[in-house]
A protein has these predicted regions:
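Extended, hydrophobic interaction surfaces within ordered domains
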Residues: 6-8, 320-330
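N-terminal export signals
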Residues: 7-27
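Histidine-centered copper-binding motifs that mark active-site loops
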Residues: 17, 27-300, 321, 331-380, ...
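Active-site pocket scaffolds in enzymes
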Residues: 123-125, 131-136, 140, 272-283, ...
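Short, surface-exposed ligand- or partner-binding patches at beta-edge/loop junctions that are enriched
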Residues: 160-163, 306-319, 508-521
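Short acidic, glycine-rich loop/turn motifs
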Residues: 254, 265, 315-319, 454, ...
Length: 534
């Protein structure tokens, strides 16, 4: 069956739908420009429009407790500003679409691939059977389909998300906009009904002035791509109007490839009530919160009682070991959401249950493992890894391609893309990812303790598929081990340069599970490995 790729219309930045209906374009063979193109800056997109809820994926099932739909990744024309449209890759023509289900439901999704390359559908943060994980070795070819079906078991409540995970194609697909939110509601919600909830998917884009997604640069591959256009639910710095004293629940996903979010809310304290795996035991008051790529945060804020005031939720500069030419936005405060209090009566404060949840600490481990994250730069010296440790070749080399019995190997980078990839290996335990390589073997149901060491000069967010973990202790460079301040179920956690984390986890489902840096470009250049669970 020949693939047909449809270029459809949707919206970005809250702009109204434009044009005369459906456009059909053959995009096969289109290449990005050889010379650097002029880029669209953040000011080109209108800001301050009312915050829009995430567009929903419609449930096609009339059966209680079952969610069935079809997700179609394809190219779409998206109005960006007056007279300019961008070509993005989206699920069902929607920017950051939402699937909402409940614990105990069956999720039944058919993926119809209308891209011109392989893709997968990875359910980030959801404990699923290995065959449903959307791993690189389960790629869906262009024009083909794949069925994902699993039960959302007890304990799966939380804000998760889905995104592509093909071998050597993830960075390009994420850069084109492919991502969505998966909200799993608990069977019993312990938060008061007076709390006003908003889901916020933070993403970024880099577009040329002609509306094309700009190609990756060498700096993108080295550091993780940060697009100049910072978006919340597909909008630039939207506005949220609330009554004074409103208690807001802001549930955030950092869906960026490489951008860190150092969140502060002007004149307000943030209260953390949940992380990747759902609610924590007790609220944690914070002045600011760092959210790395792939992480989620569940925040409560009681807005000022003063009417007709504005407060900015913004991401502040964060130093994460940037290499090469430094973009100006790294040193700038980036507004995400403007909260405005209305001229209205004051909403009363709400009382939270105490505790919010119960998290049982994992017991003594049956196995302990050492995990080292490092970079090897042959032309510029070694950034942490041991040079005589065998590894699988330099970033972008053919050594990362082999599938060796695991299905086809995914999307291969273009010649242009390969040309700008730096000659650097991002490694786990001295090895770059290969499809046929299994680093660890373990047993289902056993408590594992991993000491993860970031032996490099830059931050790396560490993500584990197939389970959640507890951060037991941390050890910064030149310091002693410190117990973690609170327990949480996590699937992604940051490691600062030369920091160590002690994680405990239990794999329930057998199979091959990935763990990797969630800076997408680092993952694609080799900082990914596999554990096989029997």
């Amino acid at each position: 069956m020949k693939r047909r790729e449809f270029l459809r219309y949707t919206t970005l930045g809250g702009l109204a739908l434009s044009g005369s209906g459906l456009l059909v374009h053959a995009l096969a063979g289109r290449h990005s420009q050889t010379l650097p193109a002029a880029l669209l800056d953040n000011a080109s997109i209108p800001a301050g429009q009312p915050l829009q809820p995430l567009p929903r994926i419609v449930n096609l099932s009339d059966q209680v407790g079952r969610f069935h739909s079809v997700l179609t990744p394809a190219a779409h024309a998206v109005p960006v500003s007056d007279g300019l449209e961008a070509t993005l890759w989206l699920y069902n023509g929607k920017v950051a679409p939402l699937i909402e289900v409940r614990e105990g439901d069956e999720l039944d999704i058919t993926l119809m691939n209308e891209l011109d390359q392989d893709t997968t559908l990875h359910w980030h943060g959801v404990p699923v059977p290995q065959a449903q994980d959307g791993a690189p070795w389960d790629a869906v070819a262009s024009g083909e389909s794949r069925h994902y079906r699993y039960i959302l078991h007890r304990g799966s409540a939380g804000l998760h998300w889905f995104h592509p995970h093909p071998h050597e194609g993830t960075a390009r697909q994420v850069a084109h906009g492919l991502a969505g939110a998966l909200l799993v509601r608990p069977r019993l919600d312990v938060l008061p009904v007076e709390v006003e909830e908003h889901l916020l998917v933070v993403s970024d884009l880099r577009l040329t002035t002609e509306g094309e997604v700009a190609s990756h640069t060498a700096e993108d591959w080295m550091n993780g791509r940060e697009g100049e256009l910072l978006l919340v639910n597909g909008q630039r710095a939207p506005r949220l109007d609330v009554a004074p004293g409103t208690t807001l629940r802001l549930r955030l996903i950092n869906a960026c490839a490489g951008r860190y979010l150092r969140l502060r809310l002007e004149d307000h304290e943030l209260t953390l009530i949940g992380t990747d795996g759902g609610l924590i035991e007790r609220p944690q008051p914070l002045k600011e919160l760092l959210i790395t790529p792939g992480e989620r945060a569940d925040l409560l804020v009681r807005v000022s009682e003063k009417p007709e005031r504005s407060f900015e939720l913004a991401s502040h500069p964060y130093t994460r070991g940037w290499m090469g030419a430094k973009p100006t936005h790294l040193d700038e405060i980036a507004p995400l959401l403007s909260i405005h209090t209305l001229n209205a009566g004051v909403s009363p404060a709400v009382k939270l249950p105490n505790p919010l949840s119960h998290i049982e600490p994992l017991g003594e481990p049956a196995v302990r493992r050492q995990v080292e994250l490092a970079e090897v730069m042959p032309d510029h010296g070694d950034h942490g890894a041991v040079n005589d440790t065998p590894h699988a070749g330099h970033g972008g080399s053919d050594s990362h391609h082999g599938s060796h019995g695991r299905g086809h190997g995914g999307s291969h980078p273009s010649d242009e893309d390969r040309a700008v990839r730096p000659k650097v290996d991002f490694l786990i335990n001295g090895r770059a990812f290969a499809m046929n390589d299994v680093l660890f073997e373990g047993q289902a149901g056993e408590v594992e303790e991993w000491d993860v060491f970031n032996n490099s000069h830059m931050d790396h967010p560490f993500h584990v598929h197939g389970t959640h973990f507890q951060v037991i202790a941390t050890r910064d460079a030149d310091s002693e081990w410190q117990d973690a301040p609170w327990l949480a179920w996590k699937d992604t956690v940051n490691l600062a340069p030369y920091q160590r984390l002690r994680l405990r986890m239990v794999f329930i489902e057998p199979g091959d599970w990935l763990f990797h840096c969630h800076i997408i470009e680092h993952e694609e250049l080799g900082m990914m490995a596999t554990i096989r669970i029997s």
